[in-house]
Curated annotation (Swiss-Prot):
It comes from the Bacteria. InterPro entries: YcgL-like_sf, YcgL_dom. This is YcgL domain-containing protein PC1_1941. Pfam families: YcgL. Residues 1-85 form the YcgL domain. PANTHER family: PROTEIN YCGL (PTHR38109:SF1).
Amino acid sequence: MFCVIYRSAKRDQTYLYVEKKDDFSRVPEELMKSFGTPQLAMVLPLDERKKLANADIEKVKLALQEQGFYLQVPPPVENLLNTPV
């Protein structure tokens, strides 16, 4: 299984994973509007990998099979002023 990863033109650290290059047919239209023009980041063979840098590989595979896409959003920003020392 391969996946194609696109970077969002509108949202920092937001990535869209799809099964085929330039095939966004299963991605909801509203998501595509808020995502902006997809910028190709990379193509990955998922069968040969055990983990991904910032996403659970099993969740990615399942989402690709069931929904046809996986959306990776950045983690929430931590306010260091509120962190106890």
